[in-house]
Amino acid sequence: MKTKSKKLKSDLSIGEFEDIFQEIPEQLPVVVISEIMPIPNVDFRIEVSDNSYLKALKESETNANSFVILLTQKGLSHNKPKLTNLQRYGVLAQIITKVKIPHGDFKVRFRILQRVKIDKFLQKEPFLKVSYEKVKTVYGSIEEEKALIKLVIEKIMDKPFQLLVQNTNNFLDIIKTEPETENITDIIIFNLKIDDLDKYKYLKESHLNKRIFYILQDIQSLLIGLDLEQKINEKVKQSIDENQKEFYLREKMKAIQLELGDKAKKEEEIAELRDKIKKTPLPPEIKKKALQELSRYQTSSLMAESFVIKNYLDFLLELPWGKTSQDENDLVAIEKSLNNQHYGLQKVKERILEYAAVKIMTKKNPQNILCLVGPPGVGKTSLASSIAKALGRQFVRQSLGGLKEESEIRGHRRTYIGAMPGRILAGIRDAKTVNPVFLLDEIDKLVTNYNFDPASALLEVLDPQQNINFMDHFLSEPFDLSQVLFIATANYLDNVPEALKDRMEIIEVSSYTEKDKINIASKYLLKKQLKNHGITDTNLVIDNDTILYLIRHYTKEAGVRELDRILAELARKTVKECLIKKKEQVIITTKNVTKYLGKEKYLNLLDEQKEKIGSTNGLAYTYFGGDLLPVEVTYYKGKGQLVLTGKLGEVLKESAYTALSFIKANCQNLGIDANIFAENDFHIHLPEAAIPKDGPSAGITIATSLVSAITQKYIKKGLGMTGEITLRGNILAIGGLKEKAIAANRSGLDTIFIPQENLKDIEDIPEEVRNKLNIIPVSNISDVFSQVFVV
């Protein structure tokens, strides 16, 4: 519904007005208007389209003078109103004309006669109908009335009245010639530049002098707002003028500085850069590019552009073009250096010696990319540093954990604000040689998804056929990486993309045995901690038996990081006792170690091993090396369902279904009643439920636990097993046998069952572990069942 209005002085005589009021019905239809507040003495024109309002207009025509009640909503909304949202004060209006316009709407002209108060809503459909009472104007002191209206008119005339009122045509003439104060008041109210919702107070106020007083208040608020707006505009104008002035002065100052000093400084920089370009052994094409950029820098007057060009030239000239470090050519010295810094790790050391031997023989850098894979704490990162030291090369380390932007590898294009070179060339710059040992740490922790794929950017870096012309986006020129010895590290090879794995030579760095840890602790870690804490081996005495006790009862890890922290704690407590208690020597033994480290964190699992029903020790290969994977099975009355818990992956779940299907198919041979599967539900649980578990190698363990639970046979203590099971009961090969065997030995097991196909991998298991374990190869699950149960 659209509204238009024309502010008019009432043209009815008092007699005509009273005659009309005598004919008004006590119940009238209602039209709800929006956008404007109706005030008496106003001529309204409204476009009506709502069906219910059209019916209300039709109903009004049945009374003598076509009367309706006009109401507004509390929020002046355009939506169809609810009764609760209608104002209780409105106006009585008379329809003067009703003209049909296109689209079926009507343009209706109303004359506003008097204020009314709604008494009761009588009906809602098909149109709104109300009973009402007229709001009669209450008159106060005539002297006060005249004084107030005079003050209002003076206030309006004091300022350009267009600032206070709207629709100013004939406004002044009307209020000057209108004899009735009430009419003047209503005309001013309607024209005041205030929100229509604020005008509602005038509609419900019956006392004339109060209405005039409200006008004075609103005019005062408008005047304050106008003054505030004028002050704000002046401040904005002043700020703009000051900014323009400041900009002008700064630009002028730049020009003066350029003429006086900056110009000389820039010329000095240009001469210095030109000299560097001349002395640096750049390839011809790159030297030409550098001189072109220098020419651009010389002629550029824009500070932003000059800054980018200067950064580019600085980086280009900081790169070690053709600069190499002298490699160590004595294999015996290289081997000795590696052995002095790291215990064990023979496979990696042997590979580095081969690399050095080939380089010495061919006088060329072998194109090899090594990837050290193993659990945390086994020395992968520190070994890379030792390799650099043994070969006589610089060492650069870049951690790739959490890296997700390709630009971190290749760099940003110089068109971007804050562009920087990638990590590869930044590392080469820091090394100051083109043949460093470059460690790409945690390559399995790259963030790779449909949005990010930094692994693809590494393909060019790690491909010997491509990295001779590696292109960094920031440098925009090829750089030779063929002399760099790249070494990557990873905890879990499955997380490394296949394309990257294909470009690297994988070398497994396995978990340490107890013997390894004792040697590392006594020969390396303890000496390091004694030095770090300012004491000697006479101040802190700890023998190998105590170190073994620490390994078994205070650590549970594939590497030696926790062991190193424990030795550091013992060193700190020794220093404290030496200073406070004036001791010269602290001897740590298995009997007093709890005094310094507290109670044992891990019990000896060998003491915990008992004969159990439905519980078998599996062997797992995780991010952190090998570990035990207990499998528990129970069953209860049900409908033959299989319940799997312990945060299992899809492959592990399939192994459980396969094991159960094999047992169902062979229940007669196993001495199991077939009805037990239909009458019971089976629950398979792998403890430590918060840790995700997956893989096929638990099939043999699940099958053994199921048979034990169903037949109520005890499983011998000290057993562990690993292997994938098929529906025929065959046991297939698994990975990570070495890590699993070390974990079994560390956990106190004495016998493990492994797939027959893994016999070839037994040689990889350390001799001391092989000697302590009874390793039984099996090709079918029946071979396991015949040996694991207590007879």
From Swiss-Prot:
Pfam families from the UniProt entry: AAA (PF00004), Lon_C (PF05362), Lon_lid (PF22667), LON_substr_bdg (PF02190)
Active site: 697, 740
Residue span, Lon proteolytic domain: 610-791
Annotated GO CC locations: cytoplasm
Catalytic activity: Hydrolysis of proteins in presence of ATP
UniProt GO MF annotations: ATP binding; ATP hydrolysis activity; ATP-dependent peptidase activity; sequence-specific DNA binding; serine-type endopeptidase activity
Full protein name: Lon protease
UniProt keyword annotation of Transmembrane helix present: no
Subcellular locations according to the entry: Cytoplasm
Family: Belongs to the peptidase S16 family.
